[in-house]
Swiss-Prot record:
It comes from Gracilaria tenuistipitata var. liui. Contributes to K(+)/H(+) antiport activity by supporting proton efflux to control proton extrusion and homeostasis in chloroplasts in a light-dependent manner to modulate photosynthesis. Prevents excessive induction of non-photochemical quenching (NPQ) under continuous-light conditions. Indirectly promotes efficient inorganic carbon uptake into chloroplasts. Belongs to the CemA family. It is found in: Plastid, Chloroplast inner membrane. InterPro entries: CemA. PANTHER family: CHLOROPLAST ENVELOPE MEMBRANE PROTEIN, CHLOROPLAST ENVELOPE MEMBRANE PROTEIN-RELATED. This is Potassium/proton antiporter CemA.
Length: 278
């Protein structure tokens, strides 16, 4: 029965993207159900299908995201982490992975030196001497070397663990096509059940967040975090080129989706979106 229900759900999702507007098709479907003598039995059956679909989708989403995250953390702590730390610490002369780390380390050391001289000028450090200053600078330099060596080894560990998690995620998707089909049908039902105002609100929220006026600042922070997470150089030119092109491409794809699909599925939602966006 579950396979038959899945086929029925997928067929209903396909019907919603047909030539006839969804509002008219829903009206005819409502009349058809009201005249059907088996309407009560079908209503109970649809409730069972919806309940099974919801439970299966929630379980699949939890499994789909929790397993890769757990594997990522476990592999970093017990597999890649100790191995990379051992190899990286064997050569004490290798500290930085890229020039961005060097620039940040030198900037921190320079700020520490300026702070040290400021404390000497205001009398916070009693009887300052060149030996004391050299000792404190050496101590700070060693501290920075340890911190950035750990950051470099963690970046390599992150790359390996992330690749493993992505491989696990893709393998789960490939090996669970039926569960993915159920999830897709559930999301379609969830989206189509929203009111036109809710759809328009979500569209505006999505566009303003990712392609709106203030989105470049958010993209800049996200790209810097990703580059630092993977140990890649934080090139300002690359970041500026990305935030000046990717949101534009995303906005073009989104507008094409509205024109090509959403305008056929729910024209009233598109009209509400334009009214709210004005």
């Amino acid at each position: 029965m579950k396979y038959w229900n899945l086929k029925k759900i997928n067929q209903s999702s396909l019907d919603k993207t047909g030539v006839i507007p969804r509002s008219i098709s829903k009206l005819f479907e409502k009349f058809k159900k009201e005249l059907d003598p088996n309407a009560e039995v079908e209503a109970i059956e649809e409730f069972k299908v919806a309940r099974y679909q919801t439970i299966a989708s929630v379980k699949y989403v939890v499994f789909l995201f929790i397993i890769p995250v757990l594997i990522n953390q476990v592999s970093k702590s017990f597999l890649f982490g100790p191995f990379i730390n051992y190899l990286w610490n064997r050569d004490e002369h290798i500290i930085f992975l890229n020039h961005s780390q060097e620039e940040r380390a030198f900037a921190e050391l320079q700020r520490f030196e300026e702070k040290l001289h400021f404390e000497i000028l205001i009398g916070k450090i009693d009887s300052p001497s060149s030996n004391l200053i050299n000792y404190k600078m050496t101590e700070k330099a060693l501290e920075l070397a340890i911190d950035y060596a750990n950051e470099s080894s963690c970046a390599i560990t992150n790359i390996l663990a992330d690749l493993l998690s992505i491989a696990i995620f893709i393998s789960i998707l490939i090996s669970s096509k039926r569960q993915f089909s159920i999830l897709k049908s559930f999301l379609n039902e969830l989206i189509y059940s929203l009111s036109d105002t809710a759809k328009a609100f979500l569209i505006i929220l999505f566009t303003d967040m990712f392609v709106g006026f203030h989105s470049p600042h958010g993209w800049e922070v996200i790209i810097e975090i990703i580059l630092r997470h993977l140990g890649l150089p934080e090139s300002r030119d690359f970041i500026f080129v990305f935030i000046s092109t990717f949101p534009v491409i995303l906005d073009t794809i989104f507008k094409y989706w509205i024109f090509r699909y959403l305008n056929k599925i729910s024209p009233s939602a598109v009209a509400t979106y334009h009214n709210m966006n004005e």
